[in-house]
Structures are given as C-alpha cells and as structure tokens.
Amino acid sequence: MEPEKIQTSLPENAYRELKPGEEYTPVMPASSNPKEVTPYSVTMGVVMAVVFSAAAAFLGLKVGQVFEAAIPIAIIAVGMGSVLGKKNMLGQNVIIQSIGASSGVIVAGAIFTLPALYILGLDAAFWQVFLSSLFGGLLGIVLLIPFRKYFVKEMHGKYPFPEATATTEVLVSGEKGGSQAKLLAVAGLVGGLYDFVVGTFGLWTESVSTRICEWGAVAADKFKVVFGLNTSAAVLGLGYIIGLKYAMIITAGSCLVWFVIVPVVGSLTEAVDPAAMLSLLGVTRADIVADPQSIFTAENLFAFIGKPIGIGGIAMAGIIGIIRQSKIIRQAVGLAVSEFGGGKSAAAAPERTQRDISMKRILTILIATLISVFVFFHFGLLDGWVQSVTAILIVFIIAFLFTTVAANAIAIVGTNPVSGMTLMTLILSSLVLVSVGLSGTTGMTAALVIGGVVCTALSMAGGFITDLKIGYWLGTTPRKQEAWKFLGTFVAAATVAGVMIILNKSYGFVGEGALVAPQANAMAAVIQPLMTGGQTPWMLYFCGAALALVLTSIGVPALAFALGMFIPMELNAPLVVGGLVAWFVSGRSKDEGLNKARFDRGTLIASGFIAGGALMGVVSAVLKFVGVDWFLSGWASSNAAEWTGLAMYLVLIGYFAWHTLRAKKEE
C-alpha cells in the first residue's frame, strides 16, 4: 500500500490565533500513519544526545552559555536523511530531534548547580551527578505532560515559541526541498558564517557598547549609564520571531535596571562606604572584596543589585503565574486522580495527534521517581528521616509549581530562566534545611544536589514544551515523543556526569586556567552565607517581588519584564532590533497578502540565522575543545573591532530586511 502523501508546508493558521470554531490541521494529519519510531530514528537520536551533551557541557562551563541543541540536531537530521536518500522522514526527524534535544536541557540543569560542589571543595562522585540529572529530567517530563494540551493546543497562536518555530521551519523546509529549503540554507550559511567569524576569529566584536565613544566612556564611569548590544545573527533572528511587543517588554526591564537603578545607586559612590555596601549585599567575590570600590562599576551594580531584583521579580511572576494557572493545574491533577482511579476508562480514545502517555502511567512513573529520589537523598546525602522527607517535599513542590513558569518563559522568549528560579530554590531549600538542623558542609552539599534536581526538572520542562509544540505543528504522536524522551534523558545524564568529572580533573573550577562556570559560581556565592550565617540580599528580592505585583496590576507581563532585568541588556536590546525588522517588513504594503508573504519569508530567514548560529556554536566549541585558537584577542579587544562589529551588524540588518522584502505574494 502506498503511504499517504503528506503536505510539505505549514498551514496558513500555524502561527496565528484560531478564529471561533476553526481547527488546526497539522502537516501530518491525525488520519495519517507516519513512520516515527524506527531503529534509525532512535539510534540517531541517542548519538545526537551523546555528542551534543558533551559539547554543550564544555561550552556551558567555559563561557556560561548553553547553546540550544534542538535546531542543529534538526539540521543534521534533515541533512543525514537527504544524504541517505530517505523519503517521508518528517515523523522520524521529530523523534531524532526530541531524543537528541535532551542534551541541552540536562546540561543546563547540571552545570548551573553541580560544579558549585567542586567550587566549595565538596567532592562529587559520578553517581551523584548522574542521579541528580536523571531524576530531575524524569520529574520535568512527567510533570509537564499533563500541561501539554494547554500550552500547545489551547494557547495556539498566543505564544511565539521562537525556538520551536525555527526548528519546525528547518524540519518542514528539509521535507519540502526546493525554494524554501534553499532560502533556509542560504540564511543559515550567512548567519552561521557571520557568528563563526565573530566567535572563532574575532574579526569584529560580538557585542558593542556606548563605551566605544568618549562620551559613552564618561557616561559609564561617571554616571554608570551603559548601553550594550549583541551583534550576533542568531539573537537578531530570535528577536524577529519573538516580535516587537514581547521584545519591548523584555528590553523595558533591562532599561529600568541599566538606565535607572544602576545610575541611581552609582551616584551614591561618595555617600556610601564600599565595604558596608559589600556586607549589605553579601558580596564574597574575591576580586571585589580585594577592591571594594569596584562594586560601583555599572557591570557589578547590575550583577549584585539588578540581577537579584530580577530574581525576585521572576519568583513573584512565577507565583502569580501559578495562581493564574491554578485552574489548569487543578484540572490536570483532577484528571490524573480520576484516571488513576479508573474514572476515565470508558472515555473515547483521542485522535492520534492528541494521544499522551496515560495519566495512570504518568503517576506511576512520578511516584517511582520520587521514591528513588528519597532513597538517593536518605542513603546518599542525608542522615535523618526528617531531613530526607523535607528534601523530597522541597523538590516535588517547587518542581511541580514552577513547571508551568518554565514552560511559559520558553513559550514567550525561548529562554528558560532556570538559573534565577534555581537561585530561589537554593535560598528556600537552604532556609528550610537549616531550620531542620542541617548546615555547614553537609547542608551545602544537600542544598546543591536538591537545586540540581529542581534545576534539571525545570530546564527539562521548558525544553520539552518546545519539542511538543514542534510535534503539534507537524502532527507527530505526543505519546511517542514522551516515551522516547526518557531514553534521551538517561543518555544525556550519563554523558554530562562523565564529562563534568573529566573537566574537573582536566581544568578544575577554581584557580588559574580553571573553567569559568559563572552560574555555578553564583550558586556557590549565594549558598555559602546561607549555610554559614552570612548576609543575603533579601531586600532586593522583595523589591523585585513588589515590582512584579505592580506590573501585573497595570497589565504588563511581569515574567517577560523580570527576565529583561535578569538577562544582560546586550542580549535583550537586539530582540527589539529583530522585532522592528518584523514590524517594518510586514507593514510596508497595503496588500495584506504581500505583507504575510514577506513576514513568512522573514520567519524562514530568521530561523536560518538562529540555526546557522547554533550550529556554528557547536563547531566553535569543538575547535576550542581540541585546542584550536584562531582568535585575534588583541584586535578583538580594541575599539576598532567594536566599530567594525557595529558596521557589520548594520549590513546584516540591511541584508535581512532587503532579502525579506523580495517575497512575492504567491510564496
């Protein structure tokens, strides 16, 4: 029997909100029976999980950035299918991407917390790192599945899902071939080469700031006012897909920190004793303690005042989100309890594209995972039953409640604020553990491993919603994605644990030539005073929480705004640039059909920029790992390199707009 022919482009209503009574029909409709899970797709997925886990762990610990693995894996899956002459690979490619993308999320969860064990001089064995990552990943999967339908189906068109959009365009274009695949390939080549030249050779800088001008340097030093802009093609593409509305809200958060809070606090240089300031903020970073006056640089004021306010805002926005989504949470829990008790057994079977793992099975896996985590804590970390029960309750409650927050953040900006949420987890867990008699070395180890489990769970929840949205747009079977995600999680956790042990022995995380591991260093700095009676910036956390309440009351999305406060300005400002390009190209004509064609073409080019940048990020990581150093550090640190970067960025924007405006209505 000849397989049913599958369409090779996304439907017109893929990215917009549906009209009343309108249904979304995916690329592979529910009536079709596409190949999804095959020996080829599973093997390729596992290989991708191993390779990208190792690469992401190294790059993340080296520079603190974990590249998103979903896009480069999708490109490789499409490319391999083409090389091997395989046809109708869409379903299999989604499975490859879903298994392989476990790498980036598990890595993010592990490297943000667990290296802090080594930084604090607490040795961690392979099994501790592995089990912490594995259990966190499993919790993230099972806690997200009940919310899949809400985020990917009921909220269709309401969230931009930037990373899922880019990955879906890659997969669809690969299946279609022809002009769309060529356009994506050209955009990927342009974006990839642009970012590769910056990252590997340093011919121009990746970011520019107002410090390159004399007046800008004066403004930074005297008034603590600095404006920064990341010039990478990938972030420009991300801004296009996010759109102008959310980009402006995110950047407004950055503007509040950099143009109001930092200058105001910076103006107190003469009035405030720097040593007292360090004590008040709980700053323990060696270089600042050695030179207290350096706390008043714009960058340090952002790190120690702006970021904590952002963390408080993220936490409160999360709590507000939990309250607002309490109805969905109650429905998911009610469905689980009802099905577990056999109440839904007679219900009609859902169509193929809406079939999840049964609630009974999800609850079984959840209970088994929680029991395993309890055993891990009780026999591997803690002594008493009270401490073990307390630890498991912290993990479950925070992971359960913040799962929706992580998914929400990914749906809006494609960036999961796990480090901010994990800092709050560490603070809360440390306070609770101290109250049940745990402190010092044992307390720090326990809090960090608890943080590792929660961080990985939230990272997985955010990353997995991307996979499920891709599956929804394309028409894969959710149950198959969910089931095989467990395998990807196991493989990624084992790889990350092995790589982290090797990197600790090869480079270390403290001392000369050590890996930077910035997030883990931040975790170590936060947890040490909590467990040893030091100072914690509670007032800043409360300020952020109060700000989130005010923003919510006036109708401004608090999570997006708080994310802007936490994420550096230079990464947020280019989102507005990308959003402005989207607004410009999609409103130039009076012909709505032409505007839509231009916007769609721009989405494809932006996806190419993101994909090319992500793929070249992997190449750069591999080159760094094998010791290839082509970076012109002397030139790259000069003002001339920054001016060159600004000029090249303007050329890139011009190319993006020109190439997008070439769209024809029929396209």
Model-derived segments and spans:
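Alpha-helical multipass membrane-protein architecture
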Residues: 1-667
